Swiss-Prot record:
Family affiliation: Belongs to the class-I pyridoxal-phosphate-dependent aminotransferase family.
Lineage top rank: taxon: Eukaryota
Positions contributing to L-aspartate binding: 37, 134, 187, 379
GO biological process: 2-oxoglutarate metabolic process; aspartate metabolic process; biosynthetic process; glutamate metabolic process
UniProt-listed Enzyme Commission number(s): 2.6.1.1
Protein source organism: Daucus carota (Wild carrot)
CDD domains reported for this sequence: AAT_like
Protein name: Aspartate aminotransferase, cytoplasmic
ATP-binding keyword on record: no
Positions carrying N6-(pyridoxal phosphate)lysine: 251
Catalytic reaction(s) noted: L-aspartate + 2-oxoglutarate = oxaloacetate + L-glutamate
Amino acid sequence: MSSVFANVVRAPEDPILGVTVAYHKDQSPNKLNLGVGAYRTEEGKPLVLNVVKKAEQMLVNDQSRVKEYLPIVGLADFNKLSAKLIFGADSPAIQENRVATVQCLSGTGSLRVGGEFLARHYHEHTVYIPQPTWGNHPKIFTLAGLSVKTYRYYNPETRGLDFEGMLEDLGSAPLGAIVLLHACAHNPTGVDPTIEQWEQIRQLMRSKSLLPFFDSAYQGFASGSLDADAQSVRIFVADGGECLAAQSYAKNMGLYGERVGALSIVCKTADVASKVESQLKLVIRPMYSSPPLHGASIVAAILKDGDLYNEWTLELKAMADRIISMRQELFNALQAKGTPGDWSHIVKQIGMFTFTGLNSEQVTFMTNEYHIYLTSDGRISMAGLSSRTVPHLADAIHAAVTGKA
């Protein structure tokens, strides 16, 4: 008897997660995984922050804690503290109760809930995403019921921002369209607008009533400063206009597998925010009912305790600084080898990723000859590098560029 699912076609591996699958199959002792965006120590090991261990110990020691369901919108403390973290403690939007915040399943879940809410309650169903962007963005919004278009963002010639192209494309978008913006540390390029450029983007978007939807996956991880990395979002909130923001604590607290995130919608009035929250519950309830308790409790414990918060900012800065130093080491190694081309973009780009400018053939060559795994667009996760592995990567890039293995 054949299966009723016999005609199901095998799906391709996820372009990012598939890199790790291939890496695990490789038996080489020199193999290096620079595909997935997860922080590693200098020894190449996953890191659990000390402050997270302390918070977890506090939770374990608290005998009053139970495992009851959270409300649909999640842990109240977590939501309040998350909004403060991204918008600033003195944000008028928060003080005036104009922000609806719900706990979601990390960044992906926050984007999906936001997308589904917009598909049901916003008059314009087109979302513009940067070209390039994180591979999951188009799928998330399409499945949420929105139609996806792109705007120019990256200039491969300069390996920097195509600012003119970006303004031109947003300028010709229909009135009221939704625009996805990376709050900081753009993935995959590592290229961000300056504050002055953000201000121009804000003016253009507000003049066309374009609705900003920020994806903030790396607050504090780009520059090492939580406030600096939230400037783009705060510029838009300061003008009194409306916007959405998806937050993830995967990277900045190392809580990848806990799936902790938040969606905040900044509204014009407290009354509107309250109605928006009521509708967000209707999106969430049939999707996953309510979010997990543990990760949100860790985040809330850290954000509300002054000592833990300060310790977190130090650990976060240490992670950001290590990535910045890896950029410098890789750049220096390529300079020392005399690798053809200008590699200064490696130190200019920020955040977890570097968009190397290597093409898919060069990437395949590096994987086959040097056992280095990265996505086919040439994106490398700087967080996966160490002083020990930089020379190996520099050798591989040099060979790929010069064609001399």
